[in-house]
Amino acid sequence: MKNQTTKRSSFSGKIGFVLSAAGASVGLGNIWRFPYLAAKYGGGIFLLIYIILALTFGYTMIMAETSLGRMTKKSPVGAFASFGNSRWSSLGGWINAIIPVLIVPYDSVIGGWVLKYLVEYVRGHAQPVAEDGYFSAFISDGFSTEICFVIFSVITLAIIYAGVRNGIERVSKFMMPILVVLSVIIAIYSVTRPGALAGVKYFLVPNISNFSWMTVVAAMGQMFYSLSIAMGILITFGSYMKKETSIEESTKNVEIFDTAIAIMAGLMIIPAVFAFSGGDPDTLQAGPALMFITIPKVFASMGFGTFAGVMFFLLVLFAALTSSIALTESAVSTFEDELGWSRKKSTVLCGVIMIALGSLSSLGYGPLANVKIIGMQFLDFFDFLTNSVMMPIAAIATCLFVSRVVGVKRIEEEVTYGGGTFKRRKVFLFMIQYLCPIFAGIILLSSVANAFGWISM
């Protein structure tokens, strides 16, 4: 392995890493994506499969990526290249580096939508945003969506510009505790609504009759998105981790944080939907629109829906920011390492890419609505490309790279450095060498085949 001598930024300690990594995980993936997938794909059975995958596949990938980052002190491309040139190092390094560059633009578009809704609730417009057609009218208005998207992007870039400790870590330490408190308050409020207990049961109690292969595919895709694996973030954050920080303990804390917020998000939204609609199947199948169409209707039916709306969308805004910050940092770190640029110059370049690609997604439901890629709007296509295609490929490349090039013994040495624990060592070894690459390959083929209509799931 090539030596790394360049002075590199770092987190102040375990708390800084955990909150920043958790912030990457606890983003729109948990608050926006997880509840609508759980509602759509069987509730409790989806949750059970997700937890099993997170504790096995997710654990393995977090450990591998964080270890790679810490032992090399480099972003994805450099981390993979540190062990020589091979097809796995080239593929693994660059695909991990490119994924965040493609995700953060459309992630920021959704962040802009959240910002718009928060402003409307602060202005006391709980009833107008709940009206039929409001959301579709908003996203089809290219000017409004573009302005909201740009404002959200500028906030993200300003935090990245400030650096690791002054920007990312400081913001994560501020926002994550508030996010947890807001989650608990809203979840308690939601589950105490009349008729909500049926939603709690649907979400928490597995029903095998709701199981399908698509439930597994959806849970797997959500795990990639939610835990921020196979997208270079954990390699980048691992490169900022101090040697004395326990990788396994940090991984466990991220798992707990992520799963707890995912469950809390489900309890915020699904019981409220049941209380409002009685568990209407069409409402549960609403998909991505669940948060922007159904939830405002739920709030409008409440006595103090404006307050609930402000609290909820403030929470979602914080979650959106933490994930966009992590994604942007991964991209900026790659520019710094591979191009030798300063953080300021790298942030500006990343900003240009964000605005250019994000504008396609932002305008994709308005002026560019007739422009589609394989039948998908720009935002849907970028989500499919990254989540269903590139992330499984990145996971396969990372697994093969770790097991065949780096060697699992090196990972074990990095994890146990300074007396660090490796309690799930056997799980890690079996998953990284066998199950993870095979399972990721099956998910990749299933997702592509389903998208092109070759199979129906």
Label every model-predicted segment.
Residues 38-64, 144, 390-394:
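Extracellular loop-to-transmembrane helix junctions
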Residues 379-400, 424-457:
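A generic transmembrane alpha-helix motif of multi-pass inner-membrane proteins
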Residues 2-4, 111-140, 241-244, 249, ...:
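Helix-loop-helix connectors at the membrane interface of multi-pass transporters/channels
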Residues 13-53, 238, 249-252, 256-259, ...:
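Transmembrane helix-boundary motif of multi-pass solute transporters/channels
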Residues 10-21, 45-49, 87-101, 147-152, ...:
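Select transmembrane alpha-helical segments in multipass membrane proteins
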